[in-house]
Every structure is written in structure tokens, then in C-alpha cells.
């Protein structure tokens, strides 16, 4: 990871308006809706890019590049919500200086990748409400009024492991709740149990 540690801790892009933090991109058309409703992958991909390359891109910048290159547009695009698919490695290397690799859905694999300076574009879902998302203030209060979080899946960036916990940048809400959320090994194991979607280890092109 090229970004200095202090800057890395502060880096955060919410997909929603979030008291103005996401004002520049939350309403931009993306996927079948907009960034606020469908942009967790985009925001997490932008975090991965900036952490690994020390660039200063925002989700708006990345989406603009997609459009310039003909890579946006829901069903018509091979990008879709899968920003880190290995099918896009050539494009991502050229456009953003990163590559992705499939990684096992396990705490051990995540810790190994982070220890080698990579970051993880990670997905899960909470269809049964059995392994809720955590927030930086220590709460597990669902943001969904129905009490079930992310029933359709969600994507975050796991960027560090320190003092026995993973640090997660979750684009769902404002920075005070969702930046650098700590997940213990046990919490991460339960989070990973949410689905069997492929996880991606993301590296800088060297």
C-alpha cells in the first residue's frame, strides 16, 4: 500500500449523501439506479485504487473514466457491479494501476493478503439477520428500518489488520459510523458466512 498510514485512515467514500460527504456522486446514475442505491462496489473500488496507488480519485472520477471508456451502463456493461472481476484486469491495470486476484473466503487468507500490502474488495449479505454489520461506534444497529441489513448483498474494502481486528471501510453510511470499522476474527468469519461470492485481493501493478 503506497498511501501513508494517516491518509489511509482518513480515506473514505460513502455511497449515500451522508451529511454531504457523498454529495458529489451519490445521485449519479449507476448500475440500474444510482450510486447511493447501487454504488457500494464503485465506492469500495475507488478506496482500493487510492490506497494502493496514492492517487486522489473519487467515485465520481472513477465513474467518469468508466463512461469515457464505454464501461458504464448496467446490463450492457461488463463492469456492472463487479468492478474487480479478473476479466477487467487489463483495463484496471491500464486505467487505474491495479490488478485483482481471487482470494479464499477465510480469515487466514484475508490476514495473509493484508500482511503483504494488498487490500480486499469483499462482499457478503445478511439475508437471515444472523451476522449483522458493525459500526465504528461499536453498535450493531441496522440502518434498514426492517431490521435486516443488506439482504441483497454489500461490498466493502478491508484494508488493514491491527491489534487483533480487521479494519473495514464500509460505504453504507457516514464516516463516523462506517470508516475503519473493527471486525474481530470471529465477527469476520460470521460476516463471510453471508454468501459464497468470490472475494478479490487487489494489488498495485508493479
Functional labels for PLM-detected ranges:
Residues 47, 69-71, 107, 126-130, ...:
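Solvent-exposed loop/turn segments at secondary-structure junctions
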Amino acid at each position: 500500500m503506497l498511501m501513508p498510514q494517516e491518509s489511509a485512515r482518513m480515506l473514505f467514500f460513502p455511497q449515500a449523501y451522508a451529511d454531504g460527504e457523498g454529495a458529489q456522486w451519490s445521485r449519479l446514475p449507476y448500475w440500474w439506479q444510482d450510486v447511493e442505491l447501487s454504488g457500494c462496489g464503485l465506492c469500495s473500488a475507488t478506496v482500493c485504487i487510492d490506497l494502493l496507488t496514492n492517487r486522489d480519485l473519487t467515485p465520481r472520477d472513477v465513474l467518469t473514466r468508466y463512461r469515457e471508456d464505454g464501461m458504464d451502463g448496467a446490463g450492457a456493461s461488463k463492469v456492472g457491479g463487479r468492478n474487480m472481476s479478473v476479466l477487467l484486469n487489463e483495463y484496471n491495470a491500464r486505467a487505474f494501476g491495479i490488478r485483482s486476484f481471487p482470494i479464499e473466503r477465510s480469515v487466514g487468507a484475508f490476514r495473509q493478503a493484508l500482511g503483504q500490502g494488498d487490500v480486499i474488495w469483499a462482499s457478503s449479505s445478511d439475508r437471515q439477520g444472523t451476522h449483522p454489520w458493525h459500526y465504528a461506534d461499536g453498535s450493531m444497529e441496522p440502518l434498514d428500518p426492517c431490521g435486516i441489513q443488506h439482504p441483497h448483498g454489500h461490498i466493502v474494502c478491508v484494508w488493514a489488520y491491527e491489534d487483533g481486528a480487521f479494519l473495514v471501510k464500509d460505504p453504507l453510511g457516514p464516516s463516523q459510523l462506517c470508516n475503519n470499522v473493527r471486525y474481530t476474527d470471529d465477527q469476520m468469519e460470521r460476516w463471510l458466512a453471508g454468501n459464497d461470492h468470490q472475494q478479490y485481493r487487489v494489488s498495485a501493478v508493479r
